[in-house]
């Protein structure tokens, strides 16, 4: 018999959104995760805000959206630190070549990259790249992905297909259902889903 005091908390996921034409897909990812009883917080880069506003993320997650390193809540703890402590899994979808490079090099110049650097070792990081195929296959990006893989970061995609620039090939963000399923799998590995 379980007591009413024994409650299991929802898995906690931070969704990072970067400045890609695929940023609108992150809205569906947040919805996917919320529908599976995940508590979701969203961190957007300044360039992400050029593609999609914070409103759908705030509405679907029922949480404020972090847009700036200096966004603060009522608490004294900086947002990137409190979110790093809070998250069970961080998923960056879409992830640009720029953000991938920054995380690989330890550059922490916005709320999302600071969060990535401040994550607890047991927190899972999943990256869903989205960029032009030439950018994806460039030696610098290949090396940055190798570095992140060696650190235990998981990558999903990119997928093949027609890209916003008109080229066809590898570079599209993986389908939302696949990204979401990988997040759920990472939570299961941590006995949280």
Regions found by a protein language model. Give the residues of each.
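A cross-family phosphate/adenosyl-ligand binding-site feature
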Residues: 1-127, 133-193
């Amino acid at each position: 018999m379980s007591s009413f005091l024994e409650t299991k908390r929802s898995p906690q996921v931070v969704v990072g959104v970067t400045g890609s034409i695929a940023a609108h897909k992150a809205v569906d990812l947040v919805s996917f995760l919320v529908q599976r009883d995940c508590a979701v917080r969203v961190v957007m880069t300044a360039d992400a805000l050029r593609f999609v506003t914070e409103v759908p993320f705030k509405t679907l997650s029922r949480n404020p959206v972090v847009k700036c390193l200096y966004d603060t809540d009522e608490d004294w703890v900086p947002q990137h630190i409190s979110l790093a402590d809070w998250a069970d899994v961080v998923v960056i979808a879409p992830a640009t070549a720029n953000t991938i490079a920054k995380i690989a090099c330890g550059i922490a110049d916005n709320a999302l990259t600071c969060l990535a650097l401040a994550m607890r070792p047991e927190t899972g990081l999943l990256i869903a790249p989205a960029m032009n195929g030439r950018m994806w296959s460039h030696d610098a990006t290949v090396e940055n992905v190798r570095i992140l893989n060696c650190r235990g970061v998981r990558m999903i995609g990119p997928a093949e297909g027609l890209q916003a620039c008109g080229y066809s090939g590898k570079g599209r963000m993986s389908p939302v259902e696949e990204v979401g399923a990988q997040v759920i799998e990472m939570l299961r590995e941590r006995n949280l889903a």
